[in-house]
Curated annotation (Swiss-Prot):
Biological role: The production of the second messenger molecules diacylglycerol (DAG) and inositol 1,4,5-trisphosphate (IP3) is mediated by activated phosphatidylinositol-specific phospholipase C enzymes. In vitro, hydrolyzes PtdIns(4,5)P2 in a Ca(2+)-dependent manner. Triggers intracellular Ca(2+) oscillations in oocytes solely during M phase and is involved in inducing oocyte activation and initiating embryonic development up to the blastocyst stage.
Subcellular compartments: Nucleus; Cytoplasm, Perinuclear region
Record's protein name: 1-phosphatidylinositol 4,5-bisphosphate phosphodiesterase zeta-1
Xref: Pfam families: C2 (PF00168), EF-hand_like (PF09279), PI-PLC-X (PF00388), PI-PLC-Y (PF00387)
Comment on protein domains: The EF-hand and C2 domains are essential for triggering Ca(2+) oscillating activity and the regulation of PLCZ1 enzyme activity.
PROSITE patterns: C2, EF_HAND_2, PIPLC_X_DOMAIN, PIPLC_Y_DOMAIN
Major localization class: nucleus
Residues the record marks as active site: 177, 222
Entry coiled-coil feature ranges: none
Gene (UniProt): Plcz1
Keyword Iron-sulfur part of the UniProt annotation: no
């Protein structure tokens, strides 16, 4: 005899599907639509396969009972039912107190109370009779487990929760390189979509390569190559439209300026007329000699370019006509590599001794600190454009000692990846001392003609704020970039850990001290849910690789066993443990691949996020394609537990 619950469930189910069966039977296409109506979107390829298995007469049409079997196969997943049954006495209904027990003991929702559990029941339980009794059926439980509330990424981290009132140099800033390119750097097209896409992804520092164009119209392209050209004004109009769609926080326009003074003035007119009051053109009264905070610069556009004179001189010229005035600027290119020519990493004590010697020395003896191998390049800078540069004056990096003595608070230095890599290994303490005071931008080496990227993690480890990547090139570096800047609400600004802001702590990513607070992380890989369908995934072995990126000692990965020929619901039930020394800098990446013995592995999907942004308990890991497309409902089902020592 059917129970009260079973009758209620049957009535609810038939009320949802009966209109679709008025003609008797339904096709695979209607089956797919009906599943979506029941709040369970599916990949059509999976539906087709299960439909075929239940089409007993091979007519391409199924009955209500056949559909019920398909529905249960997709919704009443074995691993979900197992968890549900653990907290129910009759394996039919989850009482409210049992739901609270599950949420606190398994999901670590420690603030869960009666009102919160009722809210979950009201939101996810579809059967009215069960909902009214403040209980949950497997239908409601499955809907809750597949909801956004059970995603791996903490909802807290999905909001701007960090202190946004620190100076700009205290933040990692999402930055792009050659933003105008959507392919390689030699023949590839320049496209306005490069800027739109980067801004929508939360990028806050865009690169604009500016050159003289015909009819006094500055253009944007990769100079001395066959890449196509964009009008500067078109780029600026697009930025104006999309700058603050994803984030309210400031956008920095990094101008690679090759224009004549006349066309620099045209650029100035375009910037002022397009951005209006959004364009920062004067120092903020509260920040005359220090960098403002992201909060103070909300909805502002900052110009990063060469600048002549001081900020006080710029303020004195406010409102004056600067048209036709261009000044010569000598850019000194230093090739002194004394600081990065050593073979042994410098210790914290050695660095402190060297800084002390500098402070005690006669300033006149420091005048030659960057004289070796000096070259001079003369530039002509339009005063009008120069005066738009306030807190982001562009300077080439010379060396750390020069910066300590001469660099001004509003100067942003840039260095190529090769030099930055060498310094991060040999002069990590000094590098962190530098980035704690000044914004530092690291860009890909010029030999990356294919627009490939470097691993940004090694430069985040020493506090570099603007680690500029080719956003148009998918792969591991961009996965790390996207994962890093998921944090803090995807605002494009992530507060650096205190040990990268406080130079007295003596942090060295290459030799992290034992007085930190490591994390012991345990992940039970339970199953895959409707993994992406292609020919290999249905015929090949599927593996999951869990990778950790952070300081060098935290780089590690572990791999699951292979599951054969099952992309719909592979089961692993494997447990992996990681000891992470510096969790504040660590990212974790889940990779799903098909294992090909002849053709090599093929990526099915991946997901990357900061370790400290992971929820505990039973969680769903969404998957994204190589290009960054969301592959919902494809996901991994895992159990997460970790503690800090």
């Amino acid at each position: 005899m059917e129970s009260h619950y079973e009758l209620a469930e049957a009535r609810w189910f038939m009320s949802k599907i009966q209109d679709y069966f008025r003609g008797g039977k339904i096709s695979a296409g209607i089956t797919h639509k009906l599943l979506e109506k029941l709040d369970f979107p599916c990949h059509f390829a999976h539906v087709k396969r299960i439909f075929k298995e239940n089409d007993r007469h091979n007519q391409g049409r199924i009955t209500t009972e056949d559909f019920r079997t398909i529905y249960r196969c997709i919704v009443h997943r074995e691993e979900i039912v197992e968890i549900f049954n653990t907290y129910t006495e009759n394996r039919k209904i989850l009482p409210e107190d049992s739901l609270i027990e599950f949420l606190t003991q398994e999901q670590y929702e420690m603030e869960m109370d009666e009102s919160s559990s009722v809210e979950i029941i009201q939101k996810y339980e579809p059967i009215a009779e069960v909902k009214n009794e403040r209980q949950m059926s497997i239908e409601g439980f499955a809907r809750y487990m597949f909801s956004s509330e059970c995603l791996l990424f903490k909802e807290t981290c999905n909001t701007v929760y960090q202190d946004m009132n620190k100076p700009l140099n205290d933040y990692y800033i999402s930055s792009s390189h050659n933003t105008y390119l959507i392919s390689d750097q030699i023949l590839g097209p320049s496209d306005i979509w490069g800027y739109i896409s980067a801004l929508v992804k939360g990028c806050r520092c865009l690169e604009i390569d500016c050159w003289d164009g015909a009819q006094n119209e500055p253009i944007v392209y990769h100079g001395y190559t066959l890449t196509s050209k964009l009008l500067f004004k078109t780029v600026i109009q697009a930025i104006n439209k999309y700058a603050f769609v994803t984030s309210d926080y400031p956008v920095v326009l990094s101008l690679e300026n090759h224009c004549s003074p006349g066309q620099q003035e045209v650029m100035t007119d375009i910037l002022q007329s397009t951005f209006g009051d959004f364009l920062l053109s004067d120092i903020l009264d509260e920040f005359p000699d220090s960098l403002p905070s992201p909060e103070a610069l909300k909805f502002k556009i900052l110009v990063k370019n060469k600048k002549v004179g001081t900020l006080s001189e710029t303020r004195e010229r406010l409102g004056t006509d600067k048209r036709g005035i261009a000044l010569d600027l000598e850019e000194e290119i230093y090739e002194n590599e004394d600081e990065d020519s050593g073979k042994e990493p410098e210790t914290w004590d050695d660095f402190l001794s060297r800084v002390k010697e500098e402070q005690e020395a006669d300033p006149s003896t420091l005048s030659g600190i960057a004289d070796a191998k000096k070259k001079i390049r003369k530039l002509r800078v339009a005063l009008a454009l120069s005066d738009l540069v306030i807190y982001t004056k562009a300077e080439k990096f010379r060396n750390f000692q020069y910066s300590r003595v001469y660099q001004q608070f509003n100067e942003t230095t840039s260095m190529g990846e090769s030099r930055a890599r060498k310094l991060s290994k040999l002069r990590a303490h000094e590098f962190i001392f530098h980035t704690a005071a000044f914004i530092t931008r690291v860009y890909p080496k010029f030999t990356r003609a294919d627009s490939s990227n470097f691993n940004p993690q090694e430069f985040w480890n020493v506090g570099c704020q603007m680690v500029a990547l080719n956003f148009q090139t998918p792969g591991l570096p961009m996965d790390l970039q996207n994962g890093k800047f998921l944090d803090n609400g995807g605002s494009g600004y992530v507060l650096k850990p205190d040990f990268l802001r406080d130079t007295t702590l003596g942090f060295n990513p290459n030799e992290p001290e034992g007085d930190g607070h490591p994390v012991t992380l345990t992940i039970r890989l339970i199953s895959g849910i409707q993994l992406p369908v292609n020919v290999p995934s249905n015929t090949s072995d599927i593996i999951v690789i869990i990778e950790v990126y952070g300081v060098p000692n935290d780089h590690m990965k572990q791999q699951s066993r292979a599951v054969k020929n099952n992309a719909f619901s592979p089961r692993w039930n494997e447990t992996f443990t990681f000891l992470i020394q510096v969790p504040e800098l660590a990212l974790i990446r889940f990779v799903v691949e098909t294992q090909g013995f002849l053709s090599g592995n093929e990526l099915l999907g991946q997901y990357t996020l900061p370790v400290l942004c992971m929820n505990k308990g039973y969680r769903r890991v969404p998957l994204f394609s190589k290009s960054g497309a969301n592959l919902e409902p494809s996901s991994l089902f895992i159990y997460v537990w970790y503690y800090r020592e």
